[in-house]
Amino acid sequence: MIQSTSLLESWTQENNQLASSCKQDGQNEPNPEHNLFRQRRWSSDFHKLLRKIQGIPPHLDRAQLELSVVYNTCVCFTAQSQFDEAELLLTQTAQRLLQIAGDAPGTSDPSVLWRAALKSVTGTALHYRVLSLLCLQWGVWLAKSRLNAVQDFQEEMSLLEAQSGAVWNDCRAETKEKISNIPILVLDPRKLVDLLKICTAIVQGAERLTEGWSVLSALQAASASPAPRALIAYTHLLSGSCLAHMNRPHMALQCYRKALETDPRCVCAFYQSALIYRRLENSQAEIQALRILHSMLLLPSTTEPAMAAGCLLSPSLFLCSQSLSSLLSVPSALSVLHSLALKCVIHGRVSEGVECYLDLLAALQSENQHGVHAAVSTLPKLPRLYLEAGAALLMARRPADCMALCDEVIGSTQDLLPEKVLLEDPGDGRVAGSGEVTEEAENGLVRLLWTAAAYLLQGHCYSQLKDWKQAVTHYTRCISLLVKVLYKDTGFSLQMPCADKDAEQCVDLCVLQRLKGLSLAGRGISFAQIDRLREALRDLQLSRQAHPEGVSARRWYGEVLWRLDRKQEAAACWEQTWSNPIPSLSEALPVYAQELHSGPLLDSAELHQKLQELGPT
């Protein structure tokens, strides 16, 4: 008995020394790598101590110490995301508790074991230690996204929250009286309960966003909890997402604003706000949100909620559900910069768009750009980015810079172009003569379209420079590439992208038609500038067939007819053109495959004057 008492005191002292050192290191070590190394050491030391304690048969006198060491060990396991190890140890501990009480476990189901263990220690000094372990089991379930287990144990969780304060206060009073005999815990269970409560509310809220007002009420209640500001911000963020699902976008924006007021580093709130502005078609507000989001993403990483002072467990350990991760995900800084550039160009802020594109290309070329390697895969392919940037430069009246980017595209793709591309249907792309569809064959059309688009943009550049001969040459190069694509007519509309499983292939076919229409229109307009009117009329007519929505082709077709003294036909053509609205730039197709109105323009007032002089048609 004397030896047993000596062992108990020795083991208690060892636990207290380890716990004190662990708590001190947790507060003083800011380096995550060093912190992880120390956590591994502490969990190993606690586990060694636990094996010594469990090396002799379980006894009630040593149970309090054993449960404390189990708690400390499991906290260290959990801090290292070793949830399986923590759960196994917790299950074994619940079984040993029942052995001490003289009850046969009868099952390994954690819920049954914990209910039986709680019942066996009710009214005893071990009750608060078992409650502490139950906290950790709760955390493990939450970390492993086993929300059904948490929900099934809701009654016990409520009891835990209600009783823990009084029980642990009694424990602290007892600890002050017999500090050397009471095992120290590395983490105050009350802090753990507070952390788990709000993390549970956040995870459950993310899983139940579509349930409406009931979820919203729970999230609003959680927002009043004592918790780190980052977690409170998440409750506001989820409230906003819930309201967005309920088709209340303006109320959702208010919640996102609360999230940012609570924690200015909550970048996902900016991103969700941008999505709401896009839904509301408020392009200027969306651009502003994207600009701020990009600036924040360039700062050191602040996407994870910070640990509270003195807390060994990061909230991110318990926020691992797929639904929540999806809601909290934010595109990379480069992806946001690309979206910002495209939005600016499409919505008339061309100079800003150009600067964004140039910044993006510079970042992609810089080996030292933060996060660039992780972000590249989420961006369009580099030739497409060059073409988008080239289109923006063309709109900004910078033809020389546009041509330089197009030369880069042509140089990187020209030697890889197939001799011919045969498309059997919108979902099938193959090079003529090949026996099977290969990745190379599927990419053949894409590379051909990139090269053709580069020649098209260069034709536009020479048109801006009024070098009509070079413009005709480059438009012809574009057309010569496009006629290499052969396809069977299956009734598929090539004017707008389709929305089926082959949408990407459908977009490529739509781009093909647009490039045909635009290059024929460009060459026809260039022919008109050098008075080759018959050739101009032919190309403009073909352009109208390939791209009926083209405004420039229709207007210049009328102009050429007028010059050929077919004035009645010209008047009818212009009247039809004015009766149709001028389409604006769209995100449905690449910007370089849309009408940029960068070439010579016809004055509408002069055309109307001609019609008036002609008289009634």
What are these regions (language model features)?
Residues M1-T617:
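Non-TPR docking regions that flank or precede TPR/alpha-solenoid scaffolds in eukaryotic proteins
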